């Protein structure tokens, strides 16, 4: 069995989060997947509603912990959820991820077969319209993918690779002592965990530009630590496999997002000691992806959207 651990804090957009959590719970009825919500209980009406509704599902468990802090700490909530994991494999999800459990099972089986020790799935961010047609079943996963590769604009925001959606062995989560709870608010706790996971299995190749922090619309133009992790995801991009992120409103002036600045500082302090003076011959993933296409006999024109 595969267990999904999902952090839940209802301080922000509680109605949207509860609705999406219920949709994930409903999806477990037809799949051999368990979901554990790491719930930061602020003892509001929304928290009581969430606990009551979600505990009614057979394959869903709400692992609540008291939360009297102003800050949202996804790392702590993931670690709380993991304490209840009993399966050999775990997937790191957020409540905004569409529950494509067939995709998640596919990559769990690849780990089980020894192909790779873990997988980081790319994530395609949907617009409000794209989210609506997927949720209302006016578009399937496959039809949305076809629209994306045909350069349709109105359904999509961008493709993130790497993303935080990771399938791994539960033993590895434990070995790494989970997520670093010094990260609070939004950002970088996932990159920190993924870098540590990657370095657990592979010899670190941290180049001079590792700390470059430049998010990118294209998965092939990423640099710095995103390139470092993104190289590991190239095979999945070739297979055109990715998860979908469902739309929600953002207010960049919220404390939750402002915390990114401090979180990046924590990330930088943790990883700067491993940086070498060596540089990549290509600071992006363009050349490597082209080489992958040639090696696999794939027509690069089938992936034109990745270069946009």
Residue locations for each model-derived region?
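Cell-envelope/extracellular polymer assembly enzymes that use nucleotide-activated donors
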Residues: 1-5, 34, 192
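The conserved acidic donor/metal-binding loop of glycosyltransferases
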Residues: 94-98
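N-proximal low-complexity "stem/linker" segments adjacent to membrane-targeting elements
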Residues: 1-26
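Short aromatic/hydrophobic "clamp" motif used to bind/position activated sugar donors
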Residues: 90
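Acidic donor-binding segment of Leloir-type glycosyltransferases
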Residues: 21-66
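C-terminal catalytic/acceptor-binding lobe
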Residues: 16, 185-308
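Glycine-rich, basic loop-to-helix element that forms the pyrophosphate-binding segment
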Residues: 68-84
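Conserved catalytic core of nucleotide-sugar-dependent glycosyltransferases
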Residues: 82, 100-182
């Amino acid at each position: 069995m595969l267990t999904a651990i999902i952090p839940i804090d209802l301080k922000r957009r509680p109605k949207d989060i509860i609705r999406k959590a219920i949709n994930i719970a409903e999806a477990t009825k037809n799949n051999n997947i368990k979901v554990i919500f790491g719930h930061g209980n602020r003892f509001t009406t929304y928290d009581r509603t969430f606990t009551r509704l979600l505990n009614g599902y057979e394959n869903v468990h709400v692992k609540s912990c008291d939360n009297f802090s102003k800050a949202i700490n996804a790392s702590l909530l993931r670690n709380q959820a993991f304490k209840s994991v009993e399966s050999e494999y775990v997937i790191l999800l957020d409540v905004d991820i569409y529950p494509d459990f067939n995709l998640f099972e596919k990559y769990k089986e690849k780990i089980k077969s020894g192909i790779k020790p873990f997988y980081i799935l790319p994530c395609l961010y949907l617009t409000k319209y794209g989210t609506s047609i997927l949720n209302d079943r006016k578009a399937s996963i496959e039809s949305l993918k076809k629209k994306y590769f045909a350069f349709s604009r109105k359904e999509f925001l961008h493709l993130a690779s790497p993303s935080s959606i990771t399938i791994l062995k539960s033993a590895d989560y434990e070995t790494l002592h989970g997520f670093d709870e010094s990260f609070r608010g939004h950002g970088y706790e996932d990159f920190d965990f993924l870098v540590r996971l990657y370095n657990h299995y592979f010899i670190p190749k941290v180049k001079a530009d590792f700390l470059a922090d430049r998010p990118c619309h294209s998965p092939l133009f990423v640099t710095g630590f995103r390139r470092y992790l993104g190289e590991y995801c190239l095979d999945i991009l070739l297979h055109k496999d990715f998860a979908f992120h469902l739309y929600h409103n953002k207010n960049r002036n919220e404390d939750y997002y402002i915390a990114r600045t401090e979180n990046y500082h924590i990330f930088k302090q943790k990883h700067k000691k491993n940086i070498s003076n060596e540089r990549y011959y290509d600071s992006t993933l363009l050349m490597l992806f082209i080489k992958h296409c040639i090696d696999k006999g794939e027509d690069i024109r089938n992936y034109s959207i990745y270069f946009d």
